[in-house]
Regions:
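Short conserved micro-motifs at the rims of enzyme active sites and ligand-binding pockets
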Residues: 44-45, 83-85, 270-271
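Hydrophobic side chains in beta-strands
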Residues: 33-35, 75, 260
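A generic structural signal for short, non-catalytic loop/turn and secondary-structure boundary residues
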Residues: 7-9, 26, 66, 141, ...
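Aromatic- and carboxylate-enriched substrate-binding clefts and catalytic-loop regions
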Residues: 104-289
Length: 289
């Protein structure tokens, strides 16, 4: 679903696309489309739409912890992948003094490779920091809650996971890295086990689960019946993956925050994510609103 404004005729053109995975049989479906024609402000219409979403039992939003509404520092804008302990701790002290309450350690914690690629994603071992748990405790001692970043769909060709799950990808031709196929239960279990282990081993407060929208059909994605898959639909498999991750992480810490970005938020994503970011827009007050 989307909309765009056309200056030439002063109209807003809307579109709704159905059956984007039209590769397998569908017996029945139903949908509800809300069109708000009231003369009210845009923000009020959105607020009322969110309340409407919440009426649907299968779209009940996740619990939102207090920390999700507090200022958060992300290392991406300052460091990109080039993370260094002492500089990071200095930034944490400064952030705390300015009123920040949490930090997301973004891309770079999992590898010493600074080439802004995803060749080594998939294993998620903290190569850069000898004792990542100790670093997390140091940051917590400063007074910040700590979450870490994962590019959920990607499995780099230089990772051990790539060899382990060979043949279980939606595509191997993505510009960043091969994309896991969540229709395989072992893929979902593997990914969730990584997050659960990290939460326990490092005493984490949250996760940034990135690139969820790259779980989709690609030109080379197979929809042929396969005994190893327990879903035909990619969307339904992603729903199962994220629900499983959310449930397991909140068993460890009921106040766990799970961050998504606006590009792939919506009524379904509110079931799992409880911290929603506008986009990659540092220093942009308008976009951040």
């Amino acid at each position: 679903m989307g909309a765009k404004y056309r200056e030439e005729d002063d109209f807003i053109y809307c579109k709704v696309t159905l059956f984007t995975e039209c590769k397998y049989a569908i017996q029945n479906f139903n949908m509800e489309l809300r069109v708000d024609r009231r003369k009210i402000g845009f923000s009020q219409a959105l607020q009322d739409t969110a309340a409407w979403w919440e009426r649907f039992e299968n779209l009940s939003p996740a619990y939102v912890p207090v920390i999700a509404k507090k200022p958060l520092y992300s290392t991406w804008y300052q460091f990109h992948q080039d993370l260094e302990v002492q500089k990071l701790l200095e930034e944490c002290r400064l952030a705390k003094s300015l009123g920040f309450e949490s930090i997301i350690i973004d891309d770079g914690w999992q590898t010493e490779d600074n080439n802004r690629g995803y060749d080594f994603t998939g294993d998620w071992e903290s190569e850069r920091f000898a004792d990542f748990g100790h670093l997390v405790n140091q940051i917590r001692d400063i007074g910040l809650k700590v979450g870490i970043w994962y590019s959920v769909p990607f499995c780099g060709k230089k990772s051990k996971a790539y060899q382990k799950f060979k043949g279980k990808f939606l595509t191997e031709n993505h510009r960043w890295a091969p994309v896991f196929d969540p229709r395989y239960p072992e893929i979902r279990d593997y990914l969730v086990s990584i997050y659960v282990k990290a939460a326990k081993d490092w005493n984490l407060d949250g996760f940034k689960l990135d690139f969820i929208d790259d779980f989709k059909a690609y030109p080379d994605t197979s929809f042929e019946p396969h005994n190893g898959r327990d879903f035909s639909s990619i969307n339904e498999a992603v729903d199962a993956l994220l629900m499983q991750a959310s449930v397991e992480l909140k068993k460890i810490n009921p106040e766990m925050f799970i961050e998504f970005r606006q590009k792939y938020t919506g009524p379904a994503m509110r079931k799992y994510g409880n911290m929603l970011r506008a986009f990659d827009c540092p220093g942009d007050a308008v976009m951040n609103r």
